[in-house]
Amino acid sequence: LSLHIRAGEIYGFIGHNGAGKTTTLKAAVGILPFDEGNITINGRSIQTEPLACKRELAYIPDNPDLYEFMSGIRYLNFIADIFGVSAADRQARIRDYAARFELTDDLAQPIAAYSHGMKQKLAIIAAWLHRPRLVIMDEPFVGLDPKASHLLKGMMRELCDQGGAIFFSTHVLEVAEKLCDKVAIIKGGRLIRSGTMEEVKGDDSLEQVFLELEDETC
């Protein structure tokens, strides 16, 4: 498996359940160890310089495991403290993102009282707080309502327009086809096709190509 995600790119990662998407993403952010190969972020190895790498990235898992005993605002301040975000910057960013996701009135409530969608919104806000260069997300649209999904897509493109990069897995092929600059298809931990959307799908739909590749490699 060899991928190169460049600044300015939204890179989609697709495959059926159990294909290895989550394992790959967890290895990329330093959660899971690996025996061979190397993962570098902005020229630094996640194995030899994990802290330097983690300062430049944000990770949203498929089921965000938040500190439910905290309130939303306490959790966001906790994350901001970890990344050294100044008081002025965090206040402005929290105010902005919470307003976008209509979460402002809920930040004082304990996270334990949040719905799945609200937790997902909070995780997204937390990920964007320190202005990461790379955001890695596992099925980020699951649980989001249409408005929040639209907002997230805009934030992803905005980050890339500012020189960042996005790497995310999804089962929603229509979203990947419309949103991604590049896409990689994985099966059994092995890359079976990657490239720009035009290179991967040609004149067909991404769904059609994905299903054909699945059949060919069975």
Model-predicted regions and their roles:
Residues 194-195:
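ABC ATPase "signature
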Residues 110-114:
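Conserved ABC ATPase signature
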Residues 149-162:
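Helical segment within the ABC ATPase nucleotide-binding domain
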Residues 37-48, 52-53:
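Conserved ABC transporter NBD signature motif
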Residues 77, 81, 88-106:
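Conserved ABC ATPase "signature" region
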Residues 135-139:
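Catalytic Walker B motif of ABC-type/P-loop ATPase nucleotide-binding domains
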